[in-house]
Amino acid sequence: EAAIPLNAWVDKSDVVDLCEAILIVYRDRGPRANRQKSRLMWLIDELGIEQFRVEVEQQLGRTLLSAAPKDEIIWEKRDHIGIYPQKQSGLNYVGLNVPVGRLGASDMFDLARIADVYGSGELRLTVEENVIIPNVPDSRLESLLQEPLLERFSIDPAPLTRALVSCTGSKFCNFALIETKSRSVAMIKELEAELSIPKPVRIHWTGCPNSCAQPQVADIGLMGTKVRKNGKTLEGVDIYMGGTVGKDAHLGTCVQKSIPCEDLKPVLIQLLVDNFGAVPNQSLGNVDSLNRQLQLTVDRDETAVLGAKPQTSTVIFARSG
């Protein structure tokens, strides 16, 4: 279900106050005792969007203006990975790619040390599960880039690694239907070894329909499910495509259902070739060979969503954009 517009406009100086008011309303009124419904959407369903707005205004202490009739801001999404000058003269922020956001204790200590030594002791996290070190003087940049940690947390990762997002998955979440983090990293490494990819492609893995990794706003979103193949229950995914964020944002649509994870790679290869300009490397052979791999993948008469009758699958390739 898509988010419901609050029909509100605030000046940028009031954004933090508004967010705080929304959080306090949820803290005080939200169904947090029921873990199945401990999300903001359930409170909005209970109150209705108009009453929710009233509650937020009361907490904020003033009436909210109505939203602008249309989005007039031209905005391009940035991932903040790399080195960027700040508006403060002589300072930079450095964005590190943390593959699928997986940090160990030693990594955290290392990041804290690096922030202290080269920056102002501050770290920021992004929605793509990456880390930003702000306030790095020009004079310290070169030394920071020599830190061993940056061999794993790169400032210039490969295109698919750069944009990869994954939820916690079944290893640490009882709601997840599939393992996500390790599988997604392994899959991306194989895809990058077999394809030349001209630009980042946002691939988001989420373990269940709760969509913590936001697959509906990704170029390619993978939502965990259970499938049947040859009479066995396997981990699989439904595939979403075409999601965008920023100006004229919209949710992606489900283009393929019930793909066993063990059969997923050739499907992703074909999607990347057809929709994102990827070119198979020489080691892959010609595209006809690739298509034969794909046909073997989708000829799965006994594969279906749990509870549904087995049927032959037809793969539909959607053009993103």
Where are these regions (language model features)?
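Peripheral terminal and linker regions in Fe-S/redox and tRNA-modifying enzymes
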Residues: E1-G321
